[in-house]
Design a protein with these regions (language model features):
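Bilobed "Venus flytrap"/periplasmic-binding protein-like clamshell domains
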Residues: 32-104, 200-205, 215, 224
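Extracytoplasmic/secreted proteins, especially bacterial periplasmic and envelope-associated proteins
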Residues: 22, 54, 68-75, 97, ...
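Short, glycine-/small- and polar/acidic-enriched structural segments
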Residues: 1-56, 64, 133-134
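Short helices/loops that flank or line small-molecule/ion binding pockets
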Residues: 1, 95-110, 122-127
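Beta->alpha turn/N-cap motifs
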Residues: 1-13, 95, 111-118, 138-139
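An extracytoplasmic/periplasmic, membrane-proximal ligand-sensing/linker region
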Residues: 97, 114-134, 144-151, 175, ...
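A bilobed periplasmic-binding-protein/Venus flytrap-type ligand-binding module shared by bacterial periplasmic
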Residues: 32-45, 142-148, 165, 173-188
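Ligand-binding "clamshell"
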Residues: 9-26, 119-139, 145-160
Length: 224
């Protein structure tokens, strides 16, 4: 199971992947990996993703070092032209420690790409409320991000998705993709796929993120 950008990088041999993995095959899109770029509201006057340009030396978490969150976060910020390399004081933490750090005032924001709702975001919002902002995306920034790899699409948080969230939030998500190798027997791939989709209701009882899974969009946003 790969994040969509890693599927694209694996096929082309770009980003953190050293050479093309042309033996890889996409089986289908699973649930969405939803971008939660979070920033203290005092630094987010517009509430939009480009407010990240207001960071000037403060600590910000893109994820754990060498994690998928860090790699996709760097790609997104590079593509948007946000100068995080010189303006952010990057910290590297997992989701749990990141939540504690923002609650304690040790960081000003965090990048949490995950299936929504995310428990770490829920905890942070429960304590900080309107002092915290999940940044919105615009059509312009979405188009810019999708220029090379058209993987991302809109993902909406209606009010109440997170504690103390009173306004609609429009962010983006890319699919987590189930992949296999070209040499795996077709029947084995079929049986695995069949088991997943025939037991979707059970998966949805285990984790709310799987409620995004639908057959009609299972081939959208595949990177390979």
């Amino acid at each position: 199971l790969l994040q969509g950008p890693f599927g694209a990088w694996s096929w082309t041999g770009e980003g953190p992947v050293s050479k093309p993995q042309t033996h890889m095959r996409s089986v289908g899109a699973m649930w969405q990996n939803v971008e939660h770029f979070v920033l203290l509201s005092r630094l987010a006057p517009t509430g939009e993703i480009m407010d990240l340009n207001n960071i000037d030396g403060e600590r910000y978490v893109l994820g754990q070092r060498n994690s998928g969150a860090e790699q996709t976060g760097r790609f997104i910020l590079d593509t948007l032209g946000i100068d995080y390399q010189s303006k952010f004081n990057l910290a590297y933490m997992g989701y749990g420690p990141t939540t504690s750090a923002i609650q304690d005032g040790n960081i000003v924001g965090m990048n949490v790409p995950a299936g929504a709702p995310v428990s770490s975001i829920t905890q942070a919002y429960a304590l900080l409320g309107d002092r915290l902002t999940i940044l919105n995306w615009t059509q312009e920034t979405l188009d810019l991000l999708n220029a090379k790899y058209p993987l991302w699409d809109w993902y909406d948080f209606p009010p109440g998705t997170y504690p103390n969230q009173t306004k609609h939030i429009r962010t983006i998500g890319s699919p987590n993709v189930l992949v296999t190798r070209a040499d795996i027997p077709e029947d084995a791939v079929y049986q695995i796929t069949k088991v997943i989709w025939e037991n979707l209701a059970t998966l949805q009882e285990i984790h709310g993120a799987t409620k995004d899974m639908r057959l009609d969009i299972a081939i959208e946003g595949l990177g390979a």
